[in-house]
Amino acid sequence: MATATTTATAAFSGVVSVGTETRRIYSFSHLQPSAAFPAKPSSFKSLKLKQSARLTRRLDHRPFVVRCEASSSNGRLTQQEFTEMAWQSIVSSPDVAKENKQQIVETEHLMKALLEQKNGLARRIFSKIGVDNTKVLEATEKFIQRQPKVYGDAAGSMLGRDLEALFQRARQFKKDLKDSYVSVEHLVLAFADDKRFGKQLFKDFQISERSLKSAIESIRGKQSVIDQDPEGKYEALEKYGKDLTAMAREGKLDPVIGRDDEIRRCIQILSRRTKNNPVLIGEPGVGKTAISEGLAQRIVQGDVPQALMNRKLISLDMGALIAGAKYRGEFEDRLKAVLKEVTDSEGQIILFIDEIHTVVGAGATNGAMDAGNLLKPMLGRGELRCIGATTLDEYRKYIEKDPALERRFQQVYVDQPTVEDTISILRGLRERYELHHGVRISDSALVEAAILSDRYISGRFLPDKAIDLVDEAAAKLKMEITSKPTALDELDRSVIKLEMERLSLTNDTDKASRERLNRIETELVLLKEKQAELTEQWEHERSVMSRLQSIKEEIDRVNLEIQQAEREYDLNRAAELKYGSLNSLQRQLNEAEKELNEYLSSGKSMFREEVLGSDIAEIVSKWTGIPVSKLQQSERDKLLHLEEELHKRVVGQNPAVTAVAEAIQRSRAGLSDPGRPIASFMFMGPTGVGKTELAKALASYMFNTEEALVRIDMSEYMEKHAVSRLIGAPPGYVGYEEGGQLTETVRRRPYSVILFDEIEKAHGDVFNVFLQILDDGRVTDSQGRTVSFTNTVIIMTSNVGSQFILNNTDDDANELSYETIKERVMNAARSIFRPEFMNRVDEYIVFKPLDREQINRIVRLQLARVQKRIADRKMKINITDAAVDLLGSLGYDPNYGARPVKRVIQQNIENELAKGILRGDFKEEDGILIDTEVTAFSNGQLPQQKLTFKKIESETADAEQEEAAFSK
């Protein structure tokens, strides 16, 4: 037997004489293997005629091999003269004959083998003509079923005369078309003159030889069969690409709003003589692919220069091109076929490669050329017009490393659109999303989607994240509409529950059960009436909405037909549709909308059918975890109440809080420079007076979460080289890929409060980074990315000059004005910080030491936090003014501010409460009164004031709880 690398030859020979009649016997026979095709088809195992012993005995008692001249040249049918798909069908045809118990392999068996090939060329040819392949296969099978059958091993062992003649005709077609191998299309053409089966089949399906040739020509293009796998290269663009212009013509692409400058620049580059290849570079989600779709729509509408008129824009699918390429060189063959089709079109086809960085290195194994190197010559000479799209990071990582490839592309930067532009884009897409989901989308929802996504969803880019919000909100509403309403669902469950109860009571005979049964039956009648009413109402509402959606879909289809008619200058058809069908549909739509609106306004409606701003806020809340109520609070309300909200958390420091609130209000009203941060402050004062607390309060109120506070401790930046930690390590150093501590945080969360704590402790060179942040609102990180600080509030804290504040006695502090103290502190700051740094800070705010009264207020704030923690045990703390005064006096120290208060409360309140709970003195739902008492004079010790903890009687506690609930 032949090995996998050798091939067997099927030979047919001999004329056998029986009496006066001469008969030609056709049989497959294993001869000496030759190097053409693997000798493993199962149907060729019976090639020796010892398996046809009965036939041999009839002719001659001597054993011999029957042969027949089936080939005009060497008497052999070899794989070398056929393409792989053609040979596969020839090898499969004996199997078809064997399955149908037929001895002679004929043309109908070959036709069935051709039609059963997955993605076969024969199927593509018939589809091109407009013939249903399934029906052709059914007709072939019917013909096969009518042929005589034989039983035994002889099935499928002989080659028919008509099949032999078909091979001869196929060879002739190969010569006529100047091909090197007999391919599937030659075999299909040969069926046109097949007197046994093919001619009648083609006649039944009205297939002529001319239509076959034109279909083959459109599939093959200008290609010739020069290797044994040409079928895989036919219509390569159709197989591995999507025609964007065809999709635009059919209305399958979403409208592209704006982006006129980028599309115009692409057209400009495509119109060049050489290097006419734009590459769209931008962050993911900014609309790079949409620009190519916008160009396709313009080509279809004829809104392009003559150089691009009637061109085809094909999007190449690199995944499909690489997938399934098992052997070395197969991927390159596919790509070459695609490129050949593009170049043969003589500029009629423009290629669009999304994620073009995948081309670099694609297909390269063990020194083989990658796809990028195959593209370079064509890109440089202008033979291939290609539009690429990739992100900034991937462009830098892959394409910039290959300068020869990079210089063949012209860069087109695609920036993130503004919030206003995003709203325009959403308005343009609204109709498509309304049509898909079958709901209405309000304009307020679109505005909310753009604003909230920009403010709260970091790490993603507009318009993609805003479109996703609208899409998800519409999907959520659609799900609510299609599922059963809550009221009806509860009613159904009540009916089922009562039905089960009625069944269980049916067999009980006692009086109570009977009465209960009667009550249940009465209740069931009422519930079922209500259920039927609600079900009818729900079905009616759904039917109105589905009718509305079907009318909208019909209007969309008619609009598409009008556009096509106008493009083809069929003005009669366009006018008929526009003033006939469209007007009629518009009237129906208005009537249906009026009916639905009346139904909704009547108050009977069981669900909403419009996406509102609250729906968008709910989705943002799900994505980010920020409470919905805070998301929906308007910006204006926040700004108006900013000062009083800050005072709730920051005790005293009126000048500081007022200055911060005014700076924020000024910025948000649009009176500040849009190219700078919202505001920049330098908080100066002694420790523990509320500098960091004010920054936390501002972040929490402005951006709805304390996590929006980015705190950077400047004591970690005391060395000169530490500045690289802020903006990222330079190339070649450890941590280059990770980015900077400051820049990465702001890129991920652009709306934030940045707190640089203890700024005077940083090295002098660190301040050089702050200069451009404070002045231009941006900084360039180590990887060349520009990070914007225009939506941040920058706060720096410093203890510089605190000695001037603390050294004043209470009397002096009253005499000295705030401005005098501030002037002294500023002079101290000027001696430390450079003038160019100080000149860029918006406002310097000096914090004064806290007095006794303010410390007492802080005590109450800290005790409120203790109360929150102990509330889990359902306990309540009541504290007297005397106890607050005592804690205030214990925690008061002008040099340390409010920080000692926390320690005093921990030692005197929390420790005692913990001991009382562990001893069992205080239990759940107990009220605890914290008061003071004066100790008696004993053992020479003076009387002292100390805290006492008493358990309040339960009645008193209950009364207090009731009073508190009533007041709430």
Curated annotation (Swiss-Prot):
Keywords: ATP-binding, Chaperone, Chloroplast, Coiled coil, Nucleotide-binding, Plastid, Repeat, Stress response, Transit peptide
Chain coiled-coil ranges: 488-606
One GO process term, biological-process aspect: protein refolding
CDD domains: AAA, RecA-like_ClpB_Hsp104-like
SUPFAM superfamilies in the cross-refs: Double Clp-N motif, P-loop containing nucleoside triphosphate hydrolases
Induction conditions: By heat stress.
One GO CC term on file: chloroplast
GO molecular-function terms, A-Z: ATP binding; ATP hydrolysis activity
UniProt source species: Arabidopsis thaliana (Mouse-ear cress)
Binding site for ATP: 282-289, 685-692
Organism taxonomic ancestry: Eukaryota, Viridiplantae, Streptophyta, Embryophyta, Tracheophyta
UniProt-annotated stretches for the region Repeat 2: 159-222
Main location: plastid
Disruption phenotype: Seedling lethal when grown on soil. On agar plates supplied with sucrose, seedlings grow slowly with a chlorotic phenotype. They display irregular and small chloroplasts without starch grains in the stroma and with disorganized grana stacks and undeveloped thylakoid membranes.
Record region (Repeat 1): 82-147
Name of the protein in its database record: Chaperone protein ClpB3, chloroplastic
